[in-house]
Amino acid sequence: MLVVVSDTHSSEDHRLRGRTLTAVREADTVVHVGDFYREAVLDAFEAEARTLRAVYGNNDDAAIRDRVPKARTVEYAGVRFAVTHRHRGGDTGLVMFGRERGADAVIYGHSHTPRFDGSTALPLINPGSHAQPRGNRPAHAEIEPAGAADAGGEGDAAGELIGRLVTPDSEVFEEFRLGR
């Protein structure tokens, strides 16, 4: 499973709890979309995740900016994700960012608003914030191969992924599909 979190905004720890903490510990890969805030928080995520792929956000200190890039590409189960904290130009700018990187979808943060939009030229995924939702639901995203839950983690070979926006209390409030 690929787990996506963003906008922790903490000085000391990862602020993970409930299903979000469990998902981070069980994930094959965790993508953090920036705004850890302080280096100790990045360290805390590295201690919990098997594999952490992160980008820095506009509120991250210099120590974080020295350790992780501003943008990156992550491949999972044959699907390529362009990852950034934020990008100028709204949805169009995010789609252009993804196309420049040959991505199948774009993962971004910054707004603290959990969102999936499949109506754009490339699907856009924002996990929201598990720790500082700012009037939204606290959330993270879980993405796995279609059929993985039914096939004991095997999934299918067609490159289709199923995603969910989930609260720390295990409420799945949006499901979506992605493909190559």
Where are these regions (language model features)?
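Binuclear metal-dependent phosphoesterase catalytic core
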Residues: 101-102, 125-180
